[in-house]
Regions:
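A structural signal for short, hydrophobic beta-strand segments that form beta-sheets
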Residues: 3-7, 34-36
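Short alpha-helix capping/helix-loop boundary micro-motifs
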Residues: 17-22
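Intrinsically disordered, low-complexity Ser/Thr-rich linker and spacer segments
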Residues: 1-4, 59-63
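Glycine- and aspartate-rich repeat motifs characteristic of hemolysin/RTX-like Ca2+-binding segments
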Residues: 6, 10, 29
């Protein structure tokens, strides 16, 4: 897939693929972003505000 759709209600975007990484911003369900990569643990890398951010695979899907 080329885009990542946010499926959770309100999801943190982080600088890395885990909850221990710093939060960049919050995104909402229904928003879509360019998909860069998916980590082994299921987190998806997206482009947001010109930078790379990561969202949990529990709350996002590649479409």
């Amino acid at each position: 897939g080329v885009t990542v759709a946010i499926t959770g209600g309100s999801v943190y975007v982080r600088v890395g693929n885990g909850t221990n990484y710093r939060i960049i911003t919050t995104v909402k369900a229904g928003m879509t972003f360019d998909h860069i990569a998916t980590a082994r643990n299921g987190w998806n890398a997206i482009v947001i505000n010109g930078q790379v951010g990561w969202v949990s695979g529990k709350y996002s899907k590649v479409v």
